[in-house]
């Protein structure tokens, strides 16, 4: 987000990423664009208001990868009283200013499918609106926009160190080949997520005033538990909530956990206790209990939260903190915390802080310019795609549209039949789209394609996934 905003203001930008773009925390969220209903209990009113306002912006500028979703909260005896939930939802409806989504309401769960999949003892609840986003696609589309505005993007490139001298940084970076290079810059923005303190130490030094608290969040994916389009937000007896979200047509996404951790490297996968926690929290409400054998996939991310001294990981603020320091006249901005919903506002705040050190050709602009592929009218754009490619299955066209929006026609070109799309890898992934990911979205491995640029891996057998991996191992075949 910062690279896109800065490049669009005429700043010369080089972005260094040690792995794949979105390969860590950015693609491991619960994939919600939301104010955060539970943050009202922590009196984070400014954060909630800002996030709700941003929800409106993102639904407009990323309309093909973000869409409204209705959330149902069953009333659970012995947990939050009805008056508290109603008061919170009333505030949630109004604190973000003008909104386009339907407001909250009380619901009878047996009516209109609102309680589909739930145990019959849950008879009443509440419904409200938020939104869902494909987080990994959001990363890639921001980078496509940044690149179009002139940013130099360097994936699989490690930041080694930087020294400040006479108002400029000399940064050493290491490419995947092992070759090292030195680049110069007036400012250094440290948006390394869980590695923010590591990068700070390799540059001007760690901040004495701010530090990161690492919190592990894991999710599981199970076969879809109900056919309705709404998600569930379920209260747990530890006062946390978990989400059950329709996911990739055939599945339900369940998350998240909050576990304080000391090491990033030891926290890359879900552990058994987290799996059992999520299943137990869901099974309290479900008519058909889930078992560990139902889990078809899981993923884990480490959140780099600003350490505000909270003992409970769930109570640590999700707001962002920007720490600006100068070394021999060169500026270093370290970024702590933040959530995906407010990434664009964080970028604006970062550029505001850096304004004394940089020259901008224009002011804030990312609220007004759509991300690549975002249509102004999603329904009309999808209908136009169907009409243009009548021989291709609509389910395939719709999946492509949800990833690429109006760029789908550019991807397909003159390929009007399935045969023209090249090899069928299964899971709705064809050779033509795979090449698009490689040539236009910096994909270099099977994981980049199957689990981030798309989620085709969920719909494929292990044998088919291995075929994609083999293709990348024989990289000349997709070069």
Task: Locate the predicted segments by residue.
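Glycine-rich FAD pyrophosphate-binding loop
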Residues: 5-29
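Flavin (primarily FAD) binding-site architecture
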Residues: 190-206, 348
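Dinucleotide-binding Rossmann-like beta1-alpha1 core, especially the glycine-rich loop
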Residues: 31-114
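Short linear elements at protein peripheries
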Residues: 92-144, 152
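Short hydrophobic core segments
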Residues: 183-193, 282
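Anion (oxyanion) recognition and catalysis
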Residues: 7, 52, 147
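C-terminal catalytic lobe of FAD-dependent flavoproteins
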Residues: 122, 129, 135-138, 145, ...
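Helical element adjacent to the flavin cofactor pocket in flavoenzyme catalytic cores
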Residues: 126-187, 345
């Amino acid at each position: 987000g910062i690279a896109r905003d800065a490049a669009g203001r005429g700043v010369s930008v080089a972005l260094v990423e040690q792995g794949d773009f979105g390969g860590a925390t950015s693609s491991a969220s619960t994939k919600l664009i939301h104010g955060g209903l539970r943050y009202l209990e922590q009196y984070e009113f400014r954060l909630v208001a800002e996030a709700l306002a941003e929800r409106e912006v993102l639904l407009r500028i990323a309309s093909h990868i973000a869409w409204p979703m209705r959330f149902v909260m069953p009333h659970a005896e012995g947990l939050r009283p009805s008056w508290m939930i109603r008061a919170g939802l009333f505030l949630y409806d109004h604190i973000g200013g003008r909104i386009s989504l339907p407001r909250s309401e009380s619901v009878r769960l047996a009516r209109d499918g609102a309680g589909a999949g739930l145990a019959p003892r849950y008879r009443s609840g509440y419904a409200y609106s938020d939104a869902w986003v494909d987080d990994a696609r959001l990363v890639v589309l921001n980078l496509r926009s940044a690149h179009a505005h002139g940013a130099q993007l360097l994936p699989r490139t490690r930041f080694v160190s930087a020294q400040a001298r006479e108002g400029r940084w000399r940064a050493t970076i290491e490419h995947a080949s092992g070759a090292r290079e030195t680049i110069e810059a007036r400012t250094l923005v440290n948006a390394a997520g869980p590695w923010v303190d590591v990068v700070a130490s390799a540059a001007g030094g760690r901040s004495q005033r701010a530090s990161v608290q690492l919190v592990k969040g894991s999710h599981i994916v199970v076969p879809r538990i109900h056919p309705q389009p709404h998600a569930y937000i379920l209260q747990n007896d530890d006062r946390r909530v978990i989400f059950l979200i329709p996911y990739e047509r055939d599945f339900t996404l369940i998350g998240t956990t909050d576990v304080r951790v000391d090491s990033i490297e030891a926290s890359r996968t879900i552990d058994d206790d987290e799996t059992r926690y999520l299943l137990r929290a869901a099974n309290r409400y479900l008519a058909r209990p889930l078992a560990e054998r139902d889990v078809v996939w899981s993923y884990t991310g480490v959140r780099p939260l600003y350490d505000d001294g909270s003992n409970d990981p769930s109570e640590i603020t999700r707001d962002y903190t920007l720490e600006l320091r100068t070394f021999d006249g060169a500026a270093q901005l370290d970024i702590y915390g933040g959530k995906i919903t407010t990434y664009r506002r964080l970028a604006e705040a970062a550029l505001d802080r850096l304004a004394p050190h940089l020259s901008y050709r224009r002011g804030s602009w990312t609220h007004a310019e759509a991300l690549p592929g975002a249509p102004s009218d999603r329904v009309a754009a999808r209908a136009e795609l169907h009409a243009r490619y009548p021989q291709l299955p609509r389910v395939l066209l719709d999946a492509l549209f949800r990833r690429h929006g109006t760029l789908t026609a550019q991807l397909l070109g003159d390929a009007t039949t399935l045969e023209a799309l090249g090899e069928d890898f299964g899971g709705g992934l064809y050779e033509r789209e795979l090449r698009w990911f490689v040539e236009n979205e910096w994909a270099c491995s099977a994981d980049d394609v199957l689990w981030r640029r798309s989620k085709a891996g969920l719909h494929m057998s292990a044998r088919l996934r291995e075929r994609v991996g083999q293709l990348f191992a024989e990289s000349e075949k997709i070069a």
